[in-house]
Regions:
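Conserved mixed alpha/beta catalytic, RNA-binding, or beta-rich assembly cores of soluble enzyme
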Residues: 30, 41, 57-59, 96, ...
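Aromatic sugar-binding surface patches on proteins
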Residues: 175-184
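FAD-site-proximal beta/loop scaffold in flavoenzymes
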Residues: 35-87
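Short, aromatic- and glycine-rich surface loops/edge beta-strands on solvent-exposed regions
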Residues: 145, 158-160, 183-204
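Mid-to-C-terminal Rossmann-like scaffold of FAD/NAD(P)H-dependent oxidoreductases
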Residues: 1-2, 91, 99-171
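Helical hairpin unit composed of two closely spaced alpha helices linked by a short loop
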Residues: 65-67, 77, 96-99, 106
Length: 204
């Protein structure tokens, strides 16, 4: 979009093709009458401060690597919202902000035991990313897990397991990378005997 026409409301827009440097090609300009212009703008987490503190980042999310309390690889440093990973809804941003705040308050009180983290692993051919990347057994918390599928899948069963114990299982009629999905569990620390794995398979 190179121009927007209208005074009190949108009446039309001018659109152009772009060259390899993303510059408009004026000879391709055309006018499209319309009454609204809707912009869908991608986001990338900004983590310059986290990097300065030595926080480990996940190449898949561009955000911090965290456990279920949202604590990063640096003790006492927590990450949430779109700085952690891009959320679809502001509701999820608010919820993770509340969670990070509560976790930080507990940490400041000195109630947090020494970390006993186990990794969360997933099939990278099917999942774009999974957050959190670790579960801290010492925290004895439930877990809210966010994920995006790598592409579109239909009639899938997603399982979070530790060894042979299925901690969470949820069925999805449709999965697409444009929609973030959420999995939740109560306290599972006593059931974790090994690393946590997240898998996806055709629904039976």
């Amino acid at each position: 979009v190179t121009k927007v026409f209208g005074v009190k409301r949108v009446e039309a827009v001018e659109v152009c093709q772009v060259d390899e440097k993303m510059q408009p090609i004026e000879s391709t300009a055309r006018i499209i009458p319309c009454d609204a212009l809707i912009l869908s703008v991608g986001l990338l987490p900004e983590n310059e401060v986290a990097q300065m503190l030595g926080v480990e980042l996940d190449p898949a999310t561009k955000g911090a690597v965290v456990d279920q309390t949202l604590m990063t690889s640096v003790p006492g440093v927590f990450s949430c919202g779109n700085a952690l990973h891009v959320n679809d809804l502001v509701d999820y941003v608010s919820l993770s902000g509340d969670q990070a705040g509560e976790s930080a308050a507990e940490y400041c009180k000195g109630d947090k035991n020494a970390a006993d983290r186990v990794p969360v692993e997933y099939d990278r051919a099917k999942f774009l990313y999974v957050v959190p990347q670790y579960y801290d057994k010492a925290a004895k918390d439930g877990m809210t897990m966010y994920f995006r599928p790598r592409s579109e899948f239909k009639k899938q069963s997603v399982t979070v397991a530790s060894g042979s114990d299925a901690l969470i299982n949820k069925k999805f009629a449709n999965l697409t990378s444009s929609e973030m999905e959420v999995l939740k569990s109560e306290n599972i620390s006593d059931r974790i005997t090994d690393k946590i794995t997240v898998s996806m398979e055709d629904m039976k």
